[in-house]
Structures are given as C-alpha cells and as structure tokens.
C-alpha cells in the first residue's frame, strides 16, 4: 500500500482533478492511502513540519505546491519521493507537474484569430512561469499573423497577492484598450476578476471585451457574469501519470524521471467569448440574430448560422 500526501489548494478544482487521476491509477493497480494536506499546514509549520508529519505518517511520497526556496531535498534524504506542483517556477532537482503553457497560449490566440479579432490583451502575474509562458505563446502566435503591434498586457500583480488587487489601475488599463479586444487571462481566477470589473463599470462582455481563462474550473467560470470561457487541460491524466512516476521512483532507485506535462485539450466556449469581431454588415446581421436567440443556441438553425459565420470570417 502506497501512502501519499497531497499538499495543495483544495479550494480549486485542479487539486481534485489531480487526485482523481491518482485514484484512477490506484483502482487499477494497488491500494493507495491519500492524506489531503492544506497549504495552511506548511504555512504554519514550515517545510520541516511537513516532513515531520510525513515521517510520523510513514508517507512514501508527497505531491506538493512548494515554494522555490523550500528545501525539498529533505524528503529524498528521508526516503520520501517528492513531486512539485507548478507554483512560481519549475524545480530542477525534483520532478514537476507542469504544463505546455506555450501551447495553451497559442490555442487561445488561434481561437480569437478565428473570430476575427485584431486587438489583443493579456492579464496575468508577473512572477509565475505558467503565466509568463502562456503570455509568450499567445503573443508569438498573434505576431505571426501580423498583429504583434496590436497587443497589450497587464502583469503587475504577484501570485503572493492572489486574493488582493488594486482595482483602479487595472480598470484604467481595461478602459484604455481599443475596442473590441480579445483578452486572454492567465487562469480562471484572473478571468473572473476581469468579468467582475467589466460588469460593475458597464464594459460590455463579450461585445467590447471578450474574455478567455484557463483551467475550466466550472465553479469559477459560472461565478462570472457572463459565464467565463476557458481552456480545459488533461489534469486527471496528469494525476494518473504522476502516480505512475511515483511507483517507478519507489521501485527503481536510479530511474531517469521526466516532468509530468499537462496538455491543453479544448476550449469550453461560454458567453464571455460568444462574439465575432467584424465590420461586415451581413455578418453583423447574422450575429445579431444569433445573440437574440441565445436561449435556443442548440437548435440546428443556429448551429448552421454559427458555422456560416466562421466560414465567412475565414474567407476574409
């Protein structure tokens, strides 16, 4: 029986989806026991306190959202496998559960380009690898299509201030954007923040600013008004692969490990991006009809009209 500590933020769906993957592996192989350790435990007792608990509990492995100044080597020194869940930067001395963030950024850019947008924006953190690489992938893709000079970004906030932000400068930036703008947020939390600011300041979403997040956290996406579109990742698969890696590391002393890399799967299109940017009066007429009948959006007529709009935009 393998004993795993999952040190993570259980207020978000990412951790539960990761755990689902671990349990899928366990159900098809051997029993696992999982301790769900909240981040507050490490904040209170430090990394040595986490190790002390792990030793008392006889843990075999820990998947943790570690800070980069944490001495994660102490787990290996005590015979415990440690895997880092991406937080600010990747670790070089232990495996990471990370992602193809450039690819995610490109997927967001291609999505907006297909909708005909010519103005683009990114909202994210200044000090996290996953935010920075998503921004780079997004920008490089729109630059390749000739819109490199039509891009603005706001990356003033630290991840340490997750739940605190200064609204006035962010609002000033939003109000300065050319309209309509396609805005890619580094994750769903930040996307939700933008929809909230737009709502209370009468900036119409998606007509003026279309907003796309990442992670497809359904609670957060549906807290947004309008509901937030988001890029979905294979997080459950990542949990399964992390469990496989733990077993290999436990059974083979000198196994060469690779990071577990989550891949973007698709875009869950909700109302925050339900808009096409065009000056063509015929396409605008079709779009107005579609928006008027949103409650019937699953009818074959509206689906056919959506496909027609996509084809007409691609032909331009």
Positions of predicted regions on the chain:
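Short, well-ordered coil/turn residues at beta-beta hairpins
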Residues: 65, 185-186, 301-302
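Single conserved hydrophobic/aromatic residue that forms the stacking wall/gate
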Residues: 297-316
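Bacterial carbohydrate/catabolite-sensing allosteric modules
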Residues: 1-61, 70-296
């Amino acid at each position: 029986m393998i004993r795993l500590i999952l040190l993570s933020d259980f207020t978000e769906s990412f951790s539960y989806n990761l755990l689902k993957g671990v349990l899928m592996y366990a159900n098809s192989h051997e029993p696992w026991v999982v301790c769900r350790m909240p981040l507050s435990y490490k904040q209170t007792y430090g990394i040595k306190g986490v190790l002390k608990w792990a030793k008392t509990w006889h843990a075999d492995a820990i998947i943790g959202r570690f800070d980069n100044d944490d001495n994660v080597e102490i787990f290996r020194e005590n015979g415990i496998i440690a895997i880092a869940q991406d937080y600010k930067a990747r670790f070089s001395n232990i495996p990471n559960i990370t992602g193809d963030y450039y690819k995610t950024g490109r997927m967001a850019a291609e999505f907006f380009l297909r909708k005909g947008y010519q103005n683009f924006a990114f909202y994210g953190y200044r000090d996290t690898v996953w935010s920075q690489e998503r921004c780079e992938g997004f920008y490089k893709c729109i630059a390749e299509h000739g819109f490199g000079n039509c891009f603005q970004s706001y990356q003033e906030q630290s991840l340490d201030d997750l739940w605190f932000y200064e609204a006035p400068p962010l609002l000033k930036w939003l109000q300065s954007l050319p309209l309509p703008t396609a805005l890619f947020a580094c994750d769903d939390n930040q996307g939700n923040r933008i929809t909230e600011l737009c709502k209370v300041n009468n900036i119409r979403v998606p007509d003026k600013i279309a907003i796309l997040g990442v992670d497809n956290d359904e609670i957060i996406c549906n807290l947004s008004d309008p509901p937030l579109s988001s890029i979905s990742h294979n997080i459950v698969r990542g949990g399964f692969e992390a469990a496989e890696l733990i077993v290999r590391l436990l059974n083979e002393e000198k196994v060469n490990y690779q990071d577990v890399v989550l891949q973007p799967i698709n875009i869950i299109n909700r109302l925050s991006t339900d808009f096409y940017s065009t000056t063509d009066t015929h396409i605008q007429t079709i779009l107005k009809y579609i928006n008027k009948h949103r409650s019937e959006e699953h009818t074959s007529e509206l689906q056919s009209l959506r496909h027609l709009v996509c084809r007409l935009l691609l032909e331009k």
